[in-house]
Amino acid sequence: MTMALATRSFAAQTSGSDKVAIMQYSDDGKALGRTTLSRVRKDAEWKARLSPLAYEVTREQGTEQAFSQPGYNRHEPGLYRCVCCDNALFDAKTKYDSGTGWPSFWQPIAPENVHEISDHLFGMTRTEVRCTLCEAHLGHVFNDGPKPTGLRYCMNAVALRFIAYK
């Protein structure tokens, strides 16, 4: 992993505030435009409304067991949103089977909708992927993906909500 990848951040933050700029999408995948919103931080509410596994993964940086969630091998056209805040994250057009047992994508739907931070847990350096709007842990990005980006956004299925295109 290059240092540039490890420190890259796509979140457009307004200086001195807790505002972030994201690209909004309709449920049929059409870009609605950029908007600036307050970052969502309501951990007590997350615990009440998420399943125990979704809370552990998204709020406590957990990882679901590979091949354990039904969404890992979904192939129909659609949009993947954050299970916590509904932010649009990935278009199914960029999803591919990485053989890992987790949903994998070669790019986010809009670079500003996710951000990446260095993750040094478990004695290794990786790049964690989070939702820009609510800071939910989504998974990690690796440099072993397919063209055109060479990236593998390896996401936890429980962190994503799939909306099929109509």
Name these PLM-found stretches.
Residues M1-A12:
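N-terminal export signals
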Residues Q13-D28:
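Short N-terminal segments immediately surrounding and downstream of signal-peptide cleavage
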Residues D27-D28, L32, S38-R41, E45-R81, ...:
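A short Gly-Trp-Pro
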